[in-house]
Every structure is written in C-alpha cells, then in structure tokens.
C-alpha cells in the first residue's frame, strides 16, 4: 500500500499545481477572507455531531479556576466561537486567531453567548502569542487547530508559557489514522488538496506524540472515532496539566 500511496499522492500533488502557483504568487490570501464563511457552516455541523464529546471534555473546565475567582480562558484559533456555548458562566475569554476576518463572526457568537465575559480578540498565531503574559490564564483551549499550525511544538510551548502553574491545556483534534487502514491511505493521498481546502490543515499529523513530549506534568488523552467525514474520523481528546 505504501508504493501505491506514494504514486497517488504524486498524482494529486500534480493536480494541485495551479494551487501551488496561486499560493506562491501570494493570491491564496484571498481565500482567507471567505474561509470563515465555510468554517461557520462546518462548525455548526461539527458541534451537532460532537456535542456530547465537547460537553464531556469541557465539563471540568471550572475545576481549574483559582479558588474564589472566575475562570480565565484563552482559546487558540477561536475561529467563529464554536466552543463558547460549552464554557462555564462568568468565564473570561481571550480569543486568538491569525485570521482577522473571523472577527465579525466572533462578535456575533459572543452576543449569543452572553454567559461569558469577552476580554479581547488578539490577531496572533499559536506559535507567537507574545502579547499574552506568562502564567496569566487558567486554561488554554485548542480544538481542530493543531492540525493547521505551522509549528506544533512551538504552539504547545506558548500554551505552556501562558498557563499558570496547575492550569490546563484542553484539546480536541483530528489526527492521522492507523497505518493499516484505508483512512490512513486516503489521508496521505488527498493531503495536497486537503491543505488548500482546510486553509493549511494537515490530516496526517500524529499530534498525540507532540503532546506527550510537551513537558506537561500530567496528560489525560484518549483516541476516539468521531462520526464525521472519513478524513477526520480519528480524533484525540483530553487535557494536559502544567
């Protein structure tokens, strides 16, 4: 299967040559303006299918607030604010995303989720959140984002830096499938096209390995099969404590 996988990956890569050229010319940036429209629709469907899993994951968020104080939470790659409904009442939310075109969707989501306190929207990548102080938040949330960042280890280092001691990094990410499966085969074959469709998304990352090496004192992680499009069925879910 490895030889066939390499061959068909090359075929798909060749078909994507026009997209490679568009990106090289700097024209791909225009897609970032319309990507929030697609993501909003995708997020609604994702939340319907993953509602119970998200509710289960975020149920323990409040446990990481300082005694007698409300939770301070920073979300990396907040997108359209699809996670807001799962955050506890009174939670102070700091939103970050490298795409400034999400802002109007984010504002709408904040109005719909008035049980939260909206702190600020920071246009920043997960790899560089220099404007956020060290050990300043109780929780960092990252869902369907580590598949798209350019540097996973650096993003996790930044999350670790801004978390206070005893704080937690919550995650829900799609990952590469087991090598013995056809899902693994198609993830690799379709990856060249998937990258452009998903605004830099990579379906072939073994993200759990980065989490295991990120230096957290405790890691609670489990693999699940989400009932989604086959390319993103394999998921990891859990949290890591600083």
PLM feature spans:
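A short acidic, Gly/Pro-enriched loop at the edge of an enzyme's catalytic core
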Residues: 127-140
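C-terminal alpha-helical "lid/dimerization" subdomain adjacent to the S-adenosyl-L-methionine
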Residues: 21-34, 38-51, 172-234
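A short glycine-rich, Lys/Arg-flanked "PGG" loop and its adjoining helix->strand segment in the class I
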Residues: 153-165
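C-terminal lobe and adjacent flexible extensions of AdoMet/dcAdoMet transferase-like proteins
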Residues: 235-242
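Conserved alpha-helix/loop element of class I SAM-dependent methyltransferases that forms part
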Residues: 45-72, 82-86
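Class I SAM-dependent methyltransferase SAM/SAH-binding core
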Residues: 72-129
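A short SAM/SAH-binding and catalytic strip from SAM-dependent methyltransferases
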Residues: 138-151
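N-terminal auxiliary segments of SAM/dcSAM-dependent transferases
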Residues: 1-29
